[in-house]
């Protein structure tokens, strides 16, 4: 419980009020809660104050656009309503106070970048547990203690959800948490008051331009984690163009590279000298500030080499011995829907991956090629009501790296599938190796029944998701389940 005066020291509040939780959704308010009414992109929480009061809210903090109204108090049915100027921007700080600064009592690692956030955050949590910690994770797949993850709505939750979840993890015994930090979460100040032991930058490629409008805005949002927030250790992928630039601006950042010729300029660094890819993963010979060695990766694909090096570097920067990390690495496991391989005897190999940007699709196809002795198939679509500009770029990537391509549904949402397909098809030079099968299950069935034993089929775009959004309806759908049905 938290007293209202601990948040707002106001003389009008003569009788202090004990509060149970901070709640943003009026439908979830219970007796004793503080209802937070912020002006979001689609909904203004101030419209739901009456509903929250009916549900038993003990107090309300309400966003105002007038600085003159800041911390003024009105009473509705004897319930205090505190006006707060720029509430959304300061909500992380208020929630930090309300939940007793949980990130100060955890080792918190933030992971940002276009691709790799989920894999890295999951690997961090796995490795931390192998080193004796109780770890939790927050991100695209879900939130919770490792092994008890509950599905999440967004990659980065609301400022209140984040602080509340960290508090829950702490009280459940967690001492280590990795969190995916999206560009939306940074731009909307949802992680503002968190105390990061470290932050990792993976890469920056085209995504979310429907929201950010330009790559410059997108990069600026990501950069805030390293320049404006409370971040102690900065670990950056030097092979990314933006990452390399940031390393020149952040002298204390740690550089990580897969390039043996990388010229070290940072005071701490990690680089791969030789990488041997094989059917079960990769053997990575590396040099670093902490010593040299060979890391045996159980994950497939070159981009997972980068992911693993970023994770190991972060843990080395925390002081874990190199030999302990190398000994425990073999126990790491792949992440659901991230280059997830499904194999049956005498059948084509199926790989399910979340790749839904041109760069991620290219990397997934290159990784799949490592395991392909026959033809490489690519099944993909693009989400509706989202960045249309990346659709022809996805087509160009598929045409360059795959022998057979099937364009299908992803999550069309409210946009006509025919429009999405037209945008994708505009990117192909010719349609000789391209088929269009809108029904995703039929597309997967056709590929599996047409491909032969040495072929590889990459099913891209949905990964861990077990649903499709068609119109406003969410229907059950799993790439893995469909693939298994037709492989058996």
Curated annotation (Swiss-Prot):
Q: Which BP terms from GO are recorded?
A: cell division; cell wall organization; peptidoglycan biosynthetic process; regulation of cell shape
Describe its PTM? Carboxylation is probably crucial for Mg(2+) binding and, consequently, for the gamma-phosphate positioning of ATP.
Q: State its cofactor.
A: Mg(2+)
* Residues reported to bind ATP: 113-119
First-level EC class? ligase
EC number(s) per UniProt? 6.3.2.13
Keywords, alphabetical: ATP-binding, Cell cycle, Cell division, Cell shape, Cell wall biogenesis/degradation, Cytoplasm, Ligase, Magnesium, Nucleotide-binding, Peptidoglycan synthesis
Any one GO CC term of this protein is: cytoplasm
Listed Pfam families: Mur_ligase, Mur_ligase_C, Mur_ligase_M
One molecular function GO term is: UDP-N-acetylmuramoylalanyl-D-glutamate-2,6-diaminopimelate ligase activity
Q: Which reaction does it catalyse?
A: UDP-N-acetyl-alpha-D-muramoyl-L-alanyl-D-glutamate + meso-2,6-diaminopimelate + ATP = UDP-N-acetyl-alpha-D-muramoyl-L-alanyl-gamma-D-glutamyl-meso-2,6-diaminopimelate + ADP + phosphate + H(+)
Q: In which pathway does it act?
A: Cell wall biogenesis; peptidoglycan biosynthesis
Find motif (Meso-diaminopimelate recognition motif) and give its ranges.
Answer: 410-413
Q: Where is the signal peptide?
A: none
The UniProt annotation places meso-2,6-diaminopimelate binding at: 386, 410-413, 461, 465
Stored SUPFAM superfamilies: MurD-like peptide ligases, catalytic domain, MurD-like peptide ligases, peptide-binding domain, MurE/MurF N-terminal domain
Entry binding sites for UDP-N-acetyl-alpha-D-muramoyl-L-alanyl-D-glutamate: 24, 26, 41-43, 154-156, 182, 188, 190
Summarizing the function annotation, the protein's role is:
Catalyzes the addition of meso-diaminopimelic acid to the nucleotide precursor UDP-N-acetylmuramoyl-L-alanyl-D-glutamate (UMAG) in the biosynthesis of bacterial cell-wall peptidoglycan.
Tell me which family the UniProt entry assigns to this protein: Belongs to the MurCDEF family. MurE subfamily.
Q: Which NCBIfam families match?
A: murE, PRK00139.1-1, PRK00139.1-2, PRK00139.1-4
PANTHER family the UniProt entry points to: MUR LIGASE FAMILY MEMBER, UDP-N-ACETYLMURAMOYL-L-ALANYL-D-GLUTAMATE--2,6-DIAMINOPIMELATE LIGASE MURE HOMOLOG, CHLOROPLASTIC
Q: HAMAP family this protein is in?
A: MurE (MF_00208)
Tell me the protein's name: UDP-N-acetylmuramoyl-L-alanyl-D-glutamate--2,6-diaminopimelate ligase
The record lists the organism as Haemophilus influenzae (strain 86-028NP)
Gene from which this protein is expressed: murE
């Amino acid at each position: 419980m938290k007293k209202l005066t601990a948040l707002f020291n106001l003389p009008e509040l003569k009788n202090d009020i004990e509060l149970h939780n901070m709640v943003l959704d009026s439908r979830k308010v219970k007796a004793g809660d503080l209802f937070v009414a912020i002006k979001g992109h689609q909904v203004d929480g101030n419209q739901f104050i009456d509903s929250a009061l009916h549900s038993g809210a003990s107090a309300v903090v309400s966003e105002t656009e007038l600085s003159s109204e800041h911390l003024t108090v009105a009473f509705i049915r004897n319930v205090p309503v505190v006006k707060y100027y720029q509430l959304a921007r300061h909500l992380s700080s208020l929630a930090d106070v309300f939940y007793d600064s949980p990130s100060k009592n955890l080792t918190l690692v933030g992971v940002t970048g276009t691709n790799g956030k989920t894999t890295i955050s999951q690997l961090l949590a796995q490795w931390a547990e192998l080193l004796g910690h109780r770890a939790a994770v927050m991100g695209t797949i879900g939130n919770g203690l490792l092994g008890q993850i509950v599905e999440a709505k967004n990659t980065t939750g609301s400022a209140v959800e984040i602080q509340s979840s960290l508090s829950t993890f702490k009280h459940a015994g967690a001492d280590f948490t990795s969190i995916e930090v999206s560009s939306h979460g940074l731009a909307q100040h949802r992680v503002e008051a968190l105390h990061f032991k470290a932050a990792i930058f993976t890469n920056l490629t085209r995504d979310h331009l429907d929201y950010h409008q330009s790559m410059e805005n997108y990069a600026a949002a990501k950069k805030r984690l390293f320049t404006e927030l409370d971040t102690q250790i900065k670990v950056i992928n030097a092979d990314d163009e933006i990452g390399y630039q940031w390393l020149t601006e952040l002298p204390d950042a740690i550089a990580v590279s897969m390039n043996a010729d990388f010229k070290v300029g940072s005071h701490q660094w990690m680089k791969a000298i030789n990488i041997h890819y094989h059917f079960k993963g990769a053997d990575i010979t590396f040099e670093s500030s902490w010593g040299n060695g060979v890391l045996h990766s159980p994950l497939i694909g070159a981009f997972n080499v980068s992911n693993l090096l970023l994770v190991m570097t972060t843990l080395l920067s925390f002081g874990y011995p190199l030999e302990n990390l190398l000994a425990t690495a073999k126990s790491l496991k792949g992440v659901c829907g991230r280059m997830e391989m499904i194999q049956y005897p005498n059948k084509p190999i199926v790989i399910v991956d979340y790749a839904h940007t041109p760069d991620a699709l290219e990397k997934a196809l290159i990784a799949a090629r490592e395991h392909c002795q026959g033809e490489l198939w690519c099944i993909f679509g693009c989400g509706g009501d989202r960045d249309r500009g990346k659709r022809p770029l996805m087509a160009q990537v598929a045409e360059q790296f795959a022998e057979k391509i099937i364009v299908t549904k992803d999550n069309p949402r409210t946009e006509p599938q025919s429009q999405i397909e037209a945008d994708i098809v505009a990117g192909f030079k010719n349609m000789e190796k391209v088929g269009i099968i809108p029904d995703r299950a039929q597309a997967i069935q056709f590929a599996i029944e047409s491909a032969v034993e040495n072929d590889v089929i990459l099913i891209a775009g949905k990964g861990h998701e077990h649903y499709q959004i068609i119109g406003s309806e969410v229907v059950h759908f799993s790439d893995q389940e469909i693939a298994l049905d037709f492989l058996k």
